[in-house]
Regions:
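Ferredoxin-type iron-sulfur electron-transfer modules and their immediate structural context
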Residues: 1-104
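Iron-sulfur-cluster electron-transfer modules
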Residues: 56-62, 82-226, 232-263, 269, ...
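Short cysteine clusters
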Residues: 65-71, 75, 105-111, 115, ...
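Secreted/processed peptides and extracellular or luminal domains of membrane proteins
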Residues: 71-77, 81, 111-117, 121, ...
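Cofactor-cradling patches in redox/metallo enzymes
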Residues: 185-202, 206-285, 316-330, 335-424
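A nucleotide-sugar donor-handling region in carbohydrate enzymes
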Residues: 283-293
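C-terminal amphipathic alpha-helical segment
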Residues: 293-332
């Protein structure tokens, strides 16, 4: 400093009192710097902990997997798409696509049923599909007009097309929801195959035949009152559409005054029971309702008949209802129930889920199921889901003489015996 003519005494004249007692008056106190970041650190820490807690749930699910491949062995479509169930989890976590056609998965829960660790693979398929903007490719949806109609009615401007709670005749604490197969014109979906012969609404008509025989007052919650339950939209990955349908239906069901909601459609039943929050309302499948209310009409088949029963994936593996439908059928005098090779929790899927991927691969699964039906020697193949009936009927309408057995919903089968008893 001597070289530039400055000494300590001269420099001291330029000093300024520093409230933080630091030599540099322009520097921030360390406490002030820390205080500026407290909100960021606090909020960031909370967000981090929340995200981490969510992540650990998925991480835990991933780490449960042994890598034993039992899930792949159980998967009905594995041979068609060479998919790896373990990759579904990891690719969901990493938001990656391994090239496996995720829409070919039937979400039938056969993999989770086989898993020794009970990993819920279907939930990961659900998440992956929800990440796809715009929903599934049109090539995966055989009935695009049908899906467009159901998606359009989810919008608020369509609310006025449905009857209000105040104007709808509800005179019972029990409500019955028919599902979309009863609402949609049968010509709209299957006319090119069956020339309009399939009666998709028979399960509903038959259900009320049984309710009347049991002297049970049940209110019909038709599709002029409630919208589609949203099952197909949810499992196609159209979460926004599903949430709109759910919000509308949930509000009206809660306001209807019923305490029990019954449906013959396994998909509708599962959706209301698992994906809706219906406080104080018991959701039941029609067969479950009949069993719990002591359905016993001393029915007798007109002729001895051999039947077999197909477990719907949504009703069986996902809702664990296996015995009820069988008990109702075997209670009919003159009926012999013969099980197929794959039945109960090991039952094969009908090959179509959420109205997606109705193709040669799914057809092969139905052919396999029909071979099992023929092996039982059954005259009638029974099930408890109108959608399963419709998918199996599609194959039967091809006219193969080997498929000479009848396909019926359990509810329709029971109603037939009731009508025969009345005419006897």
């Amino acid at each position: 400093m001597a070289d530039i003519g400055l000494d300590i005494a001269s420099l001291s004249a330029y000093t300024v009192e520093n409230p933080t007692y630091h030599k540099n008056p322009k520097s921030l106190d360390a406490k002030l710097i820390y205080s500026l970041f407290i909100p960021c650190f606090g909020t960031g820490a909370i967000v981090f902990m929340l995200m981490r807690s969510m992540a650990r749930g998925y991480e835990y699910e991933m780490n449960k997997c042994y890598g034993c491949d039992l899930c792949d062995d159980a998967c009905p479509v594995r041979l068609f798409n060479a998919g790896d169930k373990l990759n579904i989890i990891y690719n969901t976590w990493n938001n990656e696509d391994d090239g496996v056609p995720m829409y070919s998965c039937l979400t039938c829960s056969a993999c989770s049923n086989a898993c020794p660790q009970l990993v819920d693979y279907d939930s990961y398929v659900d998440m992956r599909r929800a990440l796809v903007v715009g929903g599934p490719p049109a090539s995966n949806i055989p009935h695009t007009v049908l899906q467009a109609v159901l998606a359009a009615e989810a919008e608020e401007e369509r609310d006025s097309d449905f009857i209000s709670v105040e104007d709808y005749p509800i005179d019972s604490s029990i409500g019955y929801y028919p599902g979309c197969v009863d609402y949609l014109d049968q010509e709209m979906i299957f006319s090119h195959i069956n020339e309009g012969e399939m009666n998709l609404g028979d399960a509903t008509t038959s259900a009320f035949t049984l309710f009347e025989e049991m002297d049970k007052e049940v209110s019909y919650l038709g599709r002029d009152f409630l919208k589609c339950c949203g099952h197909d939209q949810k499992w196609q990955g159209m979460d926004e559409v599903f949430e709109k349908l759910k919000a509308y239906n949930q509000k009206k069901i809660q306001a209807s005054g019923i305490d029990t909601l019954v449906s013959s459609c396994a998909e509708c039943f599962r959706t209301f029971a698992k994906d809706y929050e219906l406080e104080g309302i018991k959701v039941m499948h029609t067969t479950e309702f009949l069993t719990e209310n002591g359905f016993d009409m001393n029915l007798k088949a007109e002729e001895d008949v051999t039947v077999t029963y197909h477990d719907p994936c949504r009703l069986g593996r996902q809702m664990e209802i296996y015995d009820g439908p069988r008990d109702l059928v075997t209670a009919v005098d003159g009926v012999e129930l013969v099980e197929m090779e794959h039945h109960g929790e090991d039952a094969l899927c009908c090959g179509v889920s959420s109205m997606m991927s109705c193709n040669e691969d799914s057809r092969a699964l139905r052919v396999q199921r029909f071979d099992e039906v023929r092996a039982t020697g059954a005259d009638i193949m029974l099930t408890s889901c109108p959608k399963c009936v419709s998918h199996f009927e599609c194959l039967k309408f091809e006219g193969d003489p080997k498929h000479d057995f009848e396909i019926l919903d359990v509810v329709s089968f029971l109603a037939r015996q009731v009508e025969a008893k009345k005419q006897a």
